[in-house]
Amino acid sequence: MENKICLGCLAIDKKLRNNYCPKCIKELFNGTVPNPLTFDKVEFTKKRAELSARMSISGVQDKISLTFEKKDLIPTATNGRYILKPIPSGDGHIQNEKDIAVNEHLSMLISKNIFKIPTASCGLIKFSDGELAYITKRFDYDEFSNLKYDQEDFAGVMGITPITHGENYKYDACSYLDCAKIIKKYVASSIISQEDFFKRIILNYLICNGDAHIKNFSLYSKADSIEYFLTPNYDLLNTRFHINEKYGDMAIDLLDDYTSTYEAYGYYTYDDFKTFAKYIDLPQIRFNKIMKFIEDSYQEVEILIDKSFLSPKAKEFYKESYKDRMKRLRLK
């Protein structure tokens, strides 16, 4: 029997059911074996237009909300449990758009399976014509009671809007250090969460995600709790492969002021992240352990890149850009 690759975790498995391994069927689809989508991207676009006025999911990337009807995932305006993102239609602003869905899938798996960061469950799924799309399970609903969690992104928590901080508010209004202060203020287990947040920031740096702005980090309170927690990681992508970024290596500044090292090199290095760790009270021993982990885990990252559905060109770019960032951190 031929080995096949799971569209959820990229595991090689002879016993896939409709392209998914048993673990992903349980975790991503709550035990339901999903059929391939019953519509293609053309129909997706029509459905998106029909539902856009009523859907509650935000962001600029084309997406729709899905829910199960028996074993079929169908578009819905309300109470959807999944978000579907197709390959974008080329408009000249995005390069290599055919790799975007699989790029996001790979980036999320690196976060979840290698860095062990709490990360939204996700996978790839086939349209009716076989084209792959990215699918992620919503984490803002209780799976047993179906109650929606109280969730607020960091822009909302800090009261940052286009009116208060201008059109580019998601990027210009604050630093990652300011975000860490929000975690310290609102999250009860802030010591653990600060280390989690540090790992998220350095992962975004390594994978060249230049769009990790303040709306891509959120706090939520679960249905039976008054405590706030960092939500699982979401919206991860090597953006540099798709956009010629002109404004630096990260979506927002790491610190409130540039270090002498940054001013000398023009990019963030080991010293900048060491300073960041100090300012957020991450113990030196934990910082050292994370940096050692990054160095030791590169082979796992490379294996996952090779197993992914990225094009050969995208795989090479992802590896080289990741290694370049490691060199900046004095790790390779």
Question: What is the meaning of each model-derived region?
Answer:
Residues E43-G166:
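Conserved ATP-binding subdomain of kinase catalytic cores across diverse folds
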Residues M1-D40:
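TRNA-binding/sensing appendages of the translation machinery
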Residues L28-R48, R81-K85, L109-S111, R200-H213, ...:
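Short, charge-rich amphipathic segments
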Residues M1-G8, N96-D99, K112-I114, G123-D129, ...:
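C-terminal catalytic region of ATP-dependent kinase domains
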Residues D99-F115, D172-E245:
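Conserved kinase catalytic-core segment
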Residues L37, P75-K85, K170-D178:
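Active-site-adjacent bridging/hinge elements
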Residues L37-S58, P118-T119, K137-L147, C208-K222, ...:
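Charged, low-complexity, helix/coiled-coil-prone segments
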Residues S128, A133-L206, E263, D271-T275, ...:
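ATP-dependent phospho-/nucleotidyl transfer catalytic cores
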